[in-house]
Amino acid sequence: HNVRPDGVHFTISDTGWGKAVWGKLYGQWFCESCVFVYDFEKFKAADILGVMEKYEITTFCAPPTMYRFFIQEDITKYDLSGLQYCTIAGEALNPEVYNQFYKATGLKLCEGFGQTETTLVVATLVGMEPKHGSMGKPSPQYDVALVDSDGNEVANGEVGEICLHTEKGAPIGMFKEYYRNPEKTKE
């Protein structure tokens, strides 16, 4: 999330989603960033934008659906000048939202892919130029392959499924096993 010690990081994530832990606590605290927590009953884009303005949020992450609601508001009426880095997680983002958010804020949204069982696998890493429609590059801790339905690696530019090589062991943060259920783990 490109956090820093003098920043205020805000991730919107339900606690049932792994993103709640690895997206708003572990890395942010390790980097000595303030972690902003805001509890709300129902998501309202205007309320969140107001909170981001009031508390001078510097880095922000939310599912793309929330950005779709943000662009329905007049984002320019909020002072988001403190906002320096925005990320998305959870689903693909359509170009219209990416472009409208960029036009309103001057910020390019950084995409990534991960699961509760893996943490962040592929991302627009710090220092990379965000490119709409691209999840970025594999995280250095993972040995990533794109494979077809038969498990064969596909060529660059081909569609495939993201798979992780774990023959040498699972990276830190990756799901290890089902608790006391070796049969389920073997599946």
List the predicted regions and their residue ranges.
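Gly/Ser/Thr-rich phosphate-binding loop
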Residues: 1, 5-9, 30, 57-62, ...
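Beta->alpha turn/N-cap motifs
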Residues: 63-64, 168
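Conserved ATP/PPi-binding loop(s) of AMP-dependent carboxylate-activating enzymes
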Residues: 138-141, 152-187
